[in-house]
Regions:
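N-proximal, solvent-exposed amphipathic alpha-helical segments enriched in charged/polar residues
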Residues: 2-38
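Beta-strand elements of well-folded, non-transmembrane domains
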Residues: 53-57, 76
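Short, non-transmembrane amphipathic alpha-helical segments
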Residues: 61-80
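Protein-protein interaction and targeting regions used for scaffolding, dimerization, and localization
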Residues: 53, 62, 86-88
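Short edge beta-strands and adjacent turn/loop segments
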Residues: 26-54, 91-94
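A short amphipathic beta-strand at an alpha->beta junction
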Residues: 78-95
Length: 97
């Protein structure tokens, strides 16, 4: 991001933490464990993300996924001042009750 007097960059670690906290705010959802659980692209004022989730067994998967998409998009837009083009969610695991 270009600002008056220089540029601002958001590290991958910071983006990961923003997404992790947004996902954690949705009841019944968590990021899947492992290295390839999420990817976030931030370019020229636009962002997109792909997340691999674990969802609590018995929850309505489309509802939980939609809530995650909304929270992640809101967090990235608010904290990084970007337009979020897409948040892709893949439910990879179900957690036992």
């Amino acid at each position: 991001m270009q600002e008056a007097g220089g540029s601002v960059r958001v590290s991958e670690a910071a983006l990961t933490e923003i997404v992790r906290r947004a996902v954690a705010s949705v009841e019944g959802a968590r990021l899947r464990k492992g290295r390839r659980r999420l990817g976030v692209e931030l370019q020229e004022g636009r962002a997109s993300a792909e997340l691999q989730l674990a969802v609590a067994y018995g929850r309505v998967l489309p509802e939980v996924s939609a809530a995650v998409q909304e929270r992640v998009a809101q967090a990235l837009a608010r904290m990084c001042d970007v337009e979020v083009e897409a948040v892709h969610v893949i439910v990879e695991e179900l957690d036992r009750p």
